[in-house]
Each structure stands twice: as C-alpha cells, then as structure tokens.
C-alpha cells in the first residue's frame, strides 16, 4: 500500500537541498492550508481507499524540543551531516540552524512511517539522497530494522539548468485556480526542444517507439501531443481538448490533417471547432513607449506583483505569442501585438 505524506510540519522549515539561499518562511496557517490542498490534489490521482495519507504534523506538533534533542538528536553526527551536498553548498552563502535541522526531521519521518505503518522504502528526487540515507540509519539505530531508499533524476529545464519546482519559479500548479487549464497546456506546449522526448516518456502513456517517431517527424507536433496528454492527465481529456483547440485557433496547428500517426486521443479532435472564446482576456490601452513586461503580467492578473513576474521570467516561465521572454526588463510594444492582440 503506498503511503503519501505531506509536510505540514517540515513545510514550516523548508528543505535546503538544491537551494542557494534560504526559503521564504510561511506562517503555520498557510502551511496547514497548503498541506490540505496538496492532499486533495493528490487524491485525484491516488485513491484514498488504496493508499495511506498522512501529515507529519501529527507527530511533530506535540513533540517537546528537549525530548527530540535527547532521543533523536543524539543519534546524528554533525561531522557527517556537514558532508551532505545540501549542506556543503550552503555553508559559503549561509545556512540557518533551522534549515540544518531539516535532515533530522525527514529522517524521523521515515522512522515514524516505519513504526506506524511498516514502511520499508522511501522514494524521492535525487537531491533527497542524503536525507533518505539519514532516515535509513535512524530506523536501523532505533528499531534495528533494515529499510531502503530509492531516488529518481530531477526534472531539469535544459534552457535554465534549474529543476522544475514551485520555489524556483516558472512552475505550474495542478489547481486550476492557480494555473488555468490553458496556461497549464501552454506550459507543456512551450517545452524546450531538447526536453520534449524525455517529458513525453515521463508524462504520457504512448509507446516508446511512437514517441521517438513523433519527435523525429515534427518536434512541434510532439509538443502539442505532450501538452494534450499532460493536460488530460491533470484535468481530463475534455479540458485538454478545449485547450488544444484554443491554442490552435490562435497559433495554428502543427498537424491539422493528422498526417503523423499517433495513438493519442488528440488525433480524434475536430480542429474545425477551434475557437478562442475560452481564453481569459485582459484589455489595455498601450502607451506609445510600450509597457514593462512584468508590469503587464501583474496588471493582467498573471502574477500578484511585479517582483513575482520578474521571478517568473527569470525562471523561464513567461511567454509572449509562443516566444519565451527571458529579459525581466523587456518592454512590450505595439509590434508585439499583431492585430491588436497577443497571448
């Protein structure tokens, strides 16, 4: 039985793994709200009848600090913790005592999952290796049991060299209130050429040979299929079809006649039904000198502030008319709005 754990407690600290600077500290109320939202989102993909959902706040919220130091902290060597990559890369820029404790907290999570549910295997991204190993050692010391860990390669954006992640910038959300279905579709449609085949292997159920053939035949058609399949997985085939048609109505279709063979349901969509009515719109009077792009994004409701928009641009997640905007100082002018509109 899979065990799905959300970090209602550890989310109050933030994992320093892979980070060059400290995370923004969220309030307890925000973390609790986020944890519940994540649980609900995950339940769309993993039935709560066939999995164990747990929040680590259950065992951390009532734990006494002195008890934790004595019973758990005594099992860890600071010398060994300092050899972890997540710690070493932060020593020069500064690592708070708060973040330094994260490894111990995650290790204790593994111990509690093993104790309460018999968990024998922890899975995570490759940047979690040190934390997972710490957990296996803690379980062995406290319970005299052998447990295991397995890590998987991180998803790396080829153009930025950064991992896909909500704290990095340019991330998308499963919640359509945070990322609209159309924006979710466009995120995948705008995948870098070098990443398309890899992401199709990860996020579609299409046969491997078919994926290779599609990518060889037309990288843009491959992007459409990737976007459609990923959107169908997160939001439903019906929503994916609407996003595909809306994008095609604005930018055109890469294979309108379905000449490239594919088993994807995208081939069954009638592209003659393409309309752009479903697109969220924002109208403005463009100044003669143009408008600073982060300001435009904020005013259009795409970001909460100019600063958030700048971070999104720097993270590689901002596009204008299917072209990535990489300069946070970019100014959009009349030429960027052919026929008086843009996406």
Roles of regions detected by a PLM:
Residues 7-13, 76, 199-203:
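Short, compositionally biased low-complexity segments
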Residues 23, 27-28, 34-152, 160:
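Divalent-metal (Mg2+/Mn2+/Ca2+)-assisted nucleotide/phosphate chemistry catalytic cores
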Residues 5, 27-34, 176, 180, ...:
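Short acidic-hydrophobic sequence patches enriched in Asp/Glu that either
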Residues 10-13, 61-62, 130, 156-159, ...:
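Flexible loop/turn segments at secondary-structure boundaries
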Residues 1-15, 122-129:
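N-terminal catalytic cores of NTP/NDP-binding nucleotidyl/phosphoryl-transfer enzymes
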Residues 142-343:
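Conserved nucleotide- and phosphate/pyrophosphate-binding catalytic cores
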Residues 7-11, 110, 177:
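Short connector loops/turns at beta-strand edges and beta->alpha or beta->beta junctions
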Residues 12-24, 116-117, 181:
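Acidic/polar active-site rim loop that often engages polyanionic ligands
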């Amino acid at each position: 039985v899979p065990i799905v754990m959300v970090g209602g407690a550890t989310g109050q600290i933030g994992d320093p793994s892979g980070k060059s600077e400290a995370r923004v500290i969220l309030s307890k109320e925000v973390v609790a709200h986020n944890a519940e939202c994540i649980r609900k989102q995950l339940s769309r993909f993993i039935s709560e009848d066939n999995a164990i959902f747990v929040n680590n706040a259950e065992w951390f919220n009532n734990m006494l600090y002195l008890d934790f130091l004595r019973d758990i902290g005594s099992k860890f060597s600071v010398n060994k913790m300092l050899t972890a990559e997540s710690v070493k890369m932060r020593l020069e820029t500064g690592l708070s005592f708060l973040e330094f404790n994260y490894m111990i907290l995650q290790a204790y999570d593994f111990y509690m999952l093993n104790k309460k549910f018999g968990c024998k295997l922890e899975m995570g991204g490759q940047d979690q290796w040190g934390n997972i190993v710490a957990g296996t050692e803690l379980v062995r010391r406290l319970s005299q049991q052998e447990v295991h860990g397995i890590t998987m390669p991180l998803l790396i954006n080829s153009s930025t060299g950064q991992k896909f992640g909500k704290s990095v910038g340019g991330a998308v959300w499963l919640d359509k209130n945070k990322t609209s279905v159309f924006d979710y579709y466009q995120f995948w449609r705008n995948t870098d050429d070098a990443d398309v085949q890899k992401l199709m292997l990860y996020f579609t159920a299409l046969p491997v040979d078919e994926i290779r053939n599609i990518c060889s035949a037309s990288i843009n058609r491959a992007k459409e299929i990737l976007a459609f399949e990923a959107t169908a997985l997160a939001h439903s085939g019906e929503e994916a079809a609407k996003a595909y048609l809306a994008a095609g109505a604005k930018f055109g279709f890469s294979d309108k006649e379905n000449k490239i063979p594919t088993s994807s349901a995208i081939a069954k969509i009638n592209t003659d039904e393409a309309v752009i009515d479903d697109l969220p719109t924002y109208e403005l009077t463009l100044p003669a000198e143009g408008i600073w792009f982060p300001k435009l994004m904020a005013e259009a409701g795409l970001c909460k502030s100019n600063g958030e928009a700048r971070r999104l641009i720097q993270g590689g997640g901002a596009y204008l008319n299917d072209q990535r905007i990489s300069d946070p100082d970019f100014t959009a002018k009349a030429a960027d709005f052919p026929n008086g509109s843009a996406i």
